[in-house]
Amino acid sequence: MDITNRQAVLKNFLGNSPDWYKLAIMGFLIINPLVFFFVSPFVAGWMLVIEFIFTLAMALKCYPLQPGGLLAIQAVAIGMTSPHQVAEEIANNLEVLLLLVFMVAGIYFMKQLLLFVFTKLLLNIRSKTILSLAFCLASAFLSAFLDALTVIAVVISVSVGFYTIYHNVTSNHSDKDITDDSGIDNQDSHETLEQFRAFLRSLMMHAGVGTALGGVMTMVGEPQNLIIAKSAGWNFADFFIRMLPVTLPVFIFGLLVCLLVEKFKLFGYGAQLPERVRQVLTEYDQQANAKRTKQEKMKLIVQAIIGVWLVLALALHLAEVGLVGLSVIILATSFCGITNEHSLGKAFQEALPFTALLTVFFAVVAVIIEQSLFTPIIQFVLQASPSAQLSLFYLFNGLLSSVSDNVFVGTVYINEARSAFEHGIVSLQQFELLAVAINTGTNLPSVATPNGQAAFLFLLTSALAPLIRLSYGRMVYMALPYTLVMTIVGLLGVEFLLVPMTEWLTQAGWISLPHITNGVAIPH
């Protein structure tokens, strides 16, 4: 049937998003200028923030870059903020953009090594409880130094690969479409496949939570960590040590949850790898090992050496994080023989959409600063006692981060805390403690939903999720024990351990206060 030009434009607008979603975004774009000019810029600013959080929460309906970007462009156009203020925010956070562009791309060229490691873990550890713990620990360690998205991408690659191998064997190679189970006519084979799906689901969730447990600990673990570290004037070691009073107890209890849910088969965990599947995968791995050439073996060794360089460069703060990532790209591609421009370009595909979205975040942050939107909330929190301030910052961050994106939330709150310090409302010592509360608040409770953790959202929207029947609801349910324990232990750490442990670390000479002058933090 022929459609009118108007219908064609509406169909093209935001692509395959639901009609109600398209109407909501159009409604926002119509209402915002009216409220800004005829009601109140402050109210319009808050409407923009809520609308932007809505686009983040609806990320499965439409990637937030397009609707959020339209709202941000309009905000600049009508005068909610200026292009100069947006450019200033981007300049202040250039390190974060470099982290996303170069570090994620750099790790892309180390995927062979990471795939090798996770494959060996899966096939060589027979105890499901120990295997789950190993996946959680490996993801945590890698996420402390690499980007969580990349770590999850690698685990997804391993899982999809294994699923494909077994699915093709069990369906007698009759159909290469791994989404189609019609070739599996044996009831026993169906049950084995369902058990394998449950096994992969639990492993993916353990790995996903592992990225959060490790990612909160270091300044490169999550993008917002780098923003917080820069604002507070911390280097890699400072950040790690300052977070320990909260992150270490959370890490220990997170691993305990991993063991308990597997041992007692709670919340959908506990499924074993079927023996039939193990045999198929082991045979395949043996064939792959036999075919591996000397060239490929040397690539793995080179990538391992580059991995050591990456850890040392970050730990010793030898260069800015993005530049370390760039060095990884150059070293890995040079010594692994990747010199084709097209092959290089693939490495940047994963990170650039999120980098563009983060730039839109900064435009919304510019509106928040220009319109002083969070000033009343911050004033309310800062009226409380210093210890209560820490808990309130942690809880406010946690609540918002579980429904919105934690990079956005962390950026907004650290800017407000920094502003309070610069205006003499809080001391330097209190600002440093608030920075810890903000970082842990944005990272820990955000495992509650896929909206909060970019790695979880990446998993949910991946090709693997439908194969292993991992839906939004199931992901929230399986994350629940982790959410409750990590949030509560984190809060107790902020409330009871953070202040005394920080004082002890300062007296012991492990940490010292940075010099902050002219809005710039200079670490010792």
Curated annotation (Swiss-Prot):
Disulfide bonds: none annotated. It is a multi-pass membrane protein. It is found in: Cell inner membrane. One of its GO terms (cellular component) is plasma membrane. It comes from the Bacteria. One of its GO terms (molecular function) is sodium:proton antiporter activity. Its main location: membrane. Keywords: Antiport, Cell inner membrane, Cell membrane, Ion transport, Membrane, Sodium, Sodium transport, Transmembrane, Transmembrane helix, Transport. InterPro entries: Na+/H+_antiporter_NhaB. The chain crosses the membrane at residues 13-33, 98-118, 140-160, 239-259, 304-324, 325-345, 358-378, 448-468, 479-499. Pfam families: NhaB. It catalyses: 2 Na(+)(in) + 3 H(+)(out) = 2 Na(+)(out) + 3 H(+)(in). Belongs to the NhaB Na(+)/H(+) (TC 2.A.34) antiporter family. Na(+)/H(+) antiporter that extrudes sodium in exchange for external protons. NCBIfam families: NhaB, PRK09547.1. This is Na(+)/H(+) antiporter NhaB.
